[in-house]
């Protein structure tokens, strides 16, 4: 009986080839579009779901009297907010918009390889308390107290050092002069950074860098915008608070 039904179905398909082909293609396109829409809707709805404090994190924005948003918050405003000590707020953290950098990376003693277009975000020491990145190697505490400390993401650490090599303690030499760098920094860079930790990859659907893959974080960056000497000239930051 089953064979009879299969034969009848095949005869029907062969009898109306063009019509059935159009139906199959249309159904396939419909399923594909539905799958893409479902994926995109889940991608958007799960923004920041990787952060364990998601429900307690809020970002702070400045608006004009007309309601237009500024591109960031001045460092002086952040310092004033921290002094006010709101009862509803555990802590503040501020970051800088991610930007590409180029480095010569110490693979082993006496050997360096160039790596360009590494998407880098400068953060402060309270970033971990607010966003709770998972530490795979090294120590965030050590990085917080080390000048020019670098925290690699897992995928970048694997790409540069492979599975067996330990990246902690390796140096990365900046090969460019950042626009935020002091006047004493050469045009070719030459500033040394030290890898102090490796964290789990930060997904693309986060408010930190939506649809941009982060390769690394920097702390206590002498060439960046969070250093005190730069607050008067580069003064726009992204500010997040951890609520009680």
Annotate the PLM regions:
Residues 7-11, 45, 82, 158:
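Solvent-exposed, non-membrane alpha-helical residues enriched in polar/charged side chains
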Residues 31-34, 41, 47, 84, ...:
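Phosphate/oxyanion-binding loops and surfaces in catalytic or ligand/nucleic-acid-binding neighborhoods
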Residues 62-70, 93-126, 136-150, 175-193, ...:
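Short acidic/polar micro-motifs at solvent-exposed secondary-structure junctions
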Residues 37-106, 114, 228, 233-244:
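Membrane-proximal extracellular/periplasmic loop immediately following the first transmembrane helix
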Residues 1-7:
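Short, membrane-interfacial amphipathic segments enriched in basic
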Residues 12, 16-44, 55:
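Short, strongly hydrophobic transmembrane alpha-helices
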Residues 124-136, 152-244:
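Mid-to-C-terminal secondary-structure elements
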